[in-house]
Structure formats: structure tokens, C-alpha cells
């Protein structure tokens, strides 16, 4: 994978026209399009408004990718396949139907990922436990099993998330608002076979767990760092509980 970092160069001519060289390009993969919240509709319209890209140097593919089928692992894998086969953008950004974000959130996430060399960088968002907005946890985990196979996930404390505005390394993030580089998706496909070379649901205690966990554990097994951007905080309209804190996988 090429480690060269190229950032947009934005120049304004005497006549006021703006020229962008080396724009950051991204395609948005929208999950659960049949149940999109109004805030997400607004987020997508704003993010794909490329009249703004001359000012911020980010070009978003206005034809976002929609998955097929009801299963998240299949849907996300289908999004990746479509992205690699039919899009020529540099980044795939998963934006779930229950996440509200702004174009500035998207631009900040992509600029940080590209400038700092993150191949996978998630925005920070919280999920309410049992639907109670007063009791939330950030969707990010560290693996406390240093040696041996499997994982023992421990959730980040919210106090650590709000303590800074930079990107920090973690082991597992949610895919609700996450940027993934094209080279890393191509790289993964060399090691994991179809039909699920990227996302899969790990099983523990006869229970299927999130496809985002499976994806991140595969990345970490390949030595790829995963980042959580504490300065990109987006809204998450989730009512179900799916806390993996303490989850042990073998």
C-alpha cells in the first residue's frame, strides 16, 4: 500500500474562480435506505452538495451506494464490491440511516484520515442503553486479549472520548459513520475469501455479533490500525441496545 499523502490544493484566481487540485474523493454507502431518518436525508443532501467542494477540496459521489438484502454483513459486503468495481473514488464512507452528520463532519473525517494516514477512521457517536438517552456509551472498543486468538472487547469510557478532539487508535469501531480507504479494502481481499472478504458476523456463545466487529478484528489481525476521531461527533438515533463491552470471542 502506497504511504504517499496527497492533500487538496485550492487556489482562487483574480476573477474569483476557484481551482482544486488533488481533491479528496469519496462515495457514500447508505445502509438501511428503507428506514432513513429525516436528519439523515438532510445529511446526505448536504454531504453530496458538490457546489461546496471547490471551497473545501472534497468531492462526494452523488450516486451513493445502497445495499441489497436485509442482512448487514451481506449489505456492507455488497457495498464494498460495488465501490471497488464501479466507483473511482478514493474513499468509501459508510453512513447509516440512523446517523446525522454535516458536510463539515465528513470533510474533517476525510482530511484527517488522508493527512494522518488512517485507512479506517470512524466518527465518534453514542448509543443509548435500553433507549435511555441519559445512559449512553460510545461505539468504540479496545481488545484486551493481547496474546492468542479471539478477542475480549472493552468499551471506551465516554470520559476518554470527550477528553480530546484528535484521532486515537482503537480496535473496534461501529460503521455508522466511518471512512475506509480503497487500498485497504483491496488489501483485505487478498487474505479473506468470498463471499465475505470484508464483513462477517463472529459467533460467541451461539450468538451472532455485529459485522462491524468481524471487520475490525480482521483488520487488526492484518496489522492495520483503526482510528476513532474524537473531534468528529455525530448524532446517532438508535433505540436498541447492542453493547459489546466484555464480549469474549474465541
Predicted region positions:
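Short beta-strand-to-loop acidic/aromatic patch adjacent to the donor-nucleotide binding site
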Residues: 88-100
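N-proximal low-complexity "stem/linker" segments adjacent to membrane-targeting elements
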Residues: 1-67
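Conserved catalytic core of nucleotide-sugar-dependent glycosyltransferases
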Residues: 102-201
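Conserved acidic residues
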Residues: 61, 90, 119
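Active-site nucleotide-sugar/metal-binding loop of Leloir-type enzymes
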Residues: 77-91
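Active-site phosphate/pyrophosphate-handling residues
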Residues: 78, 183, 214
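C-terminal catalytic/acceptor-binding lobe
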Residues: 3-12, 19-22, 189-250
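A short, glycine-/small-residue-rich helix N-cap motif at loop->alpha-helix starts
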Residues: 70-75
